[in-house]
Amino acid sequence: MDLAYDGAAFAGFAPQPGRDTVVGALGEAIARTLRLDAAPFIVGAGRTDAGVHALAQVISLDLGAAVLSEDSTDWFLRSLNHQLRGRVVVARARVLDDFHARFDATWRQYRYLVATGPALAATSALAWAVAAPLDLAAMNDASACLVGVHDFRAFCKRAPDKTPDEPLLRHVYEATWTDEPDRLGVAAAGGFVVFRIRANAFCHNQVRRLVGSLVAVGRGELVPEEIAARLQSGDARRLPAPAPAAGLALVGVGYDDLHGGPSGPGAPIR
């Protein structure tokens, strides 16, 4: 299933007892629609944090004895979207065997918006408002070192089960900043800069921590070479704070056309 949602309304994607989450809201709607005794187990391609949006999240779930045929997916979508009332929008549902939204994904793409112009006061739910001028050339120089396979320990929030010296290897395919309009019209009116990053996977807080440091480069608070040096050393001490969640959105998930499976937008968002 392909989803979109405004992350400001949720405490995150993954279920949390006593808190409103994307999985919680969606699971309840599915259970009501199919008259299940309990919400199904839902797997997402990306586990977005509180406040992080998604334009192209992909999920998989096993409905067990509740058989949903390809012919009934339109009814299923209408029922879910009616119950969710725009909090989560389900764009597509397909019946596939052995599809796993997380483990079958070959890449994920995130986009981060920074508001730099007249729209600063009106964009707090969608972008990070940064009043200082930003040097995009320096930010792109700093971003170039991210492409390839690297240990991102310096730019990730370490999970409790990971030791401090354990590498967090991720393969980044692209990482660029632009002030040009993208396919969704973002930045078309000016006053925005857009960071796009695509990788095989991301560790916790990785994009927001990278953006926080790259914006510091754009402000002249860090030199571009500092990003490469931190990748090499793994040292996170005295790095800038992570960028706010509001500017971040999951905008694409790619699959190698497994079983004709979903692929988010089908290509990286431009």
PLM regions and their residue ranges:
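Structured-RNA-binding interfaces characteristic of tRNA pseudouridine synthases
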Residues: M1-R270
